[in-house]
């Protein structure tokens, strides 16, 4: 594709205002690909200079200019010495990267029904619910999220919740080639802030909830910045589906250009849950409710808690736009399973065990509070904390587990370059503020073995922190470690005794 065509497509984007100037060179140049990474540069590629926290793409221009068909620079950051290569200047090269990537890959976002989900919690589970429902109704659907990208039968492990814009459009293009008709993706506040999804007019944009998170020097400078970044999604979608019960919903919708629909438990929601009932049998935990409003049906979930009600309501609100079969919707919601998110693992007929990604105090408090509502014989929480991270997180998680769990099993997570025993001592500092009982078992497999071996009838055991991860990071090396495998090994060992 010629550079002139790419620039024309970028300038005509319906949701992004792209301004640029051609500093020098020939806009008839053929562009064969695009990158912002000098190591991935190939002949004929467009090179987009990104000024990041660690590296500045402008520093690599001399290395790549002989290969580039065009170099895109920030206004005032580069002085062209010769005009062998086209140079385009703009005030936002991240926006340029997003728009040009879409153009280079043939605008695949326009060939898919696009669903973008933002919010502090619930994004991952809801994306899988939506994908599973649509697939059950014969609508081939791609997924981009925290755990992985799914394109047909191909799964690619994720590095960021929302990938860089080049990867997004590359994945979209692969989805189109694979015959996908829709894509559901998690849209993080960082992804919105860094223009990774800029220029995409989502068919549906979704807001789940908002709580103070990701605020700090490397993410969002303030809660207001965090909220404003989330709100950007509703300036680039046709239909906005929002949580009617969240206190920040109206702020999120300020300046929105979309038609708005809502879901929730309160009376103001377009789709709401009524008559919520908890279900608990050994090895099984879930709930039922009546969905009323724009959709009327009985819902049964093999997932616990009010947040599961919200996640499923959100999925119902989204899939309603596809006119899905009600029985397929019911069956899919009943059996939906997300790796590492309240993932039930059958180990006994007497008690319940689950794996969950809760890796900070807020998430741990949420899952433990939810599980206490089921009145278990004992609530047992097994967790550790990551090394080379905030000590405050350790104190807070220790205190939360000490208050809410009947027994805390403190173990190792990803110690990184710290000693696991030192991390455990920090967690114990938090537990010491409570009257909670605890045992310390550094080896995670041995800790899981202890939990299963000492499980009592009616217990609920939570293995928290690792979730979908299949490794343990020690001294800079990621060793294979999947809790599902550890559980299987433990059960075989116990059977042999």
Where in this protein do the model-derived segments appear?
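Short glycine-rich anion-binding loops that position phosphate/pyrophosphate groups of nucleotides
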Residues: 52-54, 189-190, 211-214, 246-247, ...
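A short, gly/pro- and small-residue-rich
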Residues: 57-68, 87-92, 96, 202-209, ...
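ATP-dependent carboxylate-amine ligase
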Residues: 1-15, 43-46, 95, 257, ...
């Amino acid at each position: 594709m010629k550079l002139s065509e790419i620039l024309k497509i970028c300038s005509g984007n319906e949701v992004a205002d792209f301004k640029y100037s051609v500093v020098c060179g020939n806009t008839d140049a053929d562009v064969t690909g695009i990158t912002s990474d000098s190591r991935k540069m190939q002949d004929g590629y467009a090179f987009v200079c990104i000024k990041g926290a660690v590296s500045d793409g402008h520093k690599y221009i001399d290395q790549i200019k002989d290969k580039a068909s065009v170099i895109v620079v920030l206004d005032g950051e580069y002085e062209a010495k010769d005009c062998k290569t086209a140079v385009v200047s703009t005030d936002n090269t991240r926006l340029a990267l997003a728009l040009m990537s879409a153009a280079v890959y043939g605008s695949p976002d326009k060939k898919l029904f696009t669903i973008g989900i933002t919010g502090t919690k619930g994004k991952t589970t809801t994306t899988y619910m939506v994908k599973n429902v649509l697939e059950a109704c014969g609508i081939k659907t791609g997924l981009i999220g925290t755990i992985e990208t799914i394109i047909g039968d191909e799964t690619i492990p994720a590095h960021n919740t929302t990938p860089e814009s080049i990867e997004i459009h590359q994945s979209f293009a692969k989805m189109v080639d694979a015959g996908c008709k829709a894509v559901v993706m998690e849209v993080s506040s960082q992804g919105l802030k860094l223009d990774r999804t800029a220029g995409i007019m989502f068919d549906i944009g979704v807001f789940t909830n908002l709580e103070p998170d990701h605020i700090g020097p490397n993410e969002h400078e303030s809660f207001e910045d965090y909220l404003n970044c989330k709100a950007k999604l509703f300036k680039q979608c046709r239909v906005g589906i929002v949580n009617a019960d969240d206190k920040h919903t109206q702020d999120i919708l300020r300046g929105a250009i979309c038609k708005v629909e809502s879901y929730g438990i309160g009376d103001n929601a377009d789709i709401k849950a009524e008559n919520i009932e908890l279900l608990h049998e050994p090895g099984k935990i879930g709930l039922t409710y009546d969905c009323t409003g724009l959709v009327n049906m009985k819902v049964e979930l093999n997932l616990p808690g009010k947040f599961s009600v919200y996640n499923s309501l959100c999925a119902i609100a989204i899939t309603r736009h596809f006119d899905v079969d009600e029985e397929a919707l019911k069956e899919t919601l009943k059996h939906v399973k997300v790796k590492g998110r309240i993932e039930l693992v059958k180990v006994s007929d007497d008690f319940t065990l689950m794996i969950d990604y809760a890796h900070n105090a807020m998430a741990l408090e949420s899952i433990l509070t939810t599980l206490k509502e089921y009145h278990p014989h004992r609530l047992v929480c097994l967790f550790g904390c990551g090394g080379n991270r905030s000590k405050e997180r350790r104190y807070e998680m220790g205190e939360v587990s000490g208050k809410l769990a009947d027994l805390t099993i403190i173990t190792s997570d990803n110690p990184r370059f710290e000693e696991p025993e030192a991390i455990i001592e920090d967690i114990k500092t938090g537990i010491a503020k409570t009257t909670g009982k605890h045992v310390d078992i550094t080896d995670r497999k041995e800790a899981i073995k202890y939990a299963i071996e000492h499980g009592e009838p009616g217990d609920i055991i939570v293995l928290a922190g690792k979730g979908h991860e299949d490794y343990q990071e020690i001294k800079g090396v990621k060793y294979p470690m999947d809790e599902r495998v550890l559980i299987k090994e433990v059960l075989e060992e116990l059977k042999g005794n």
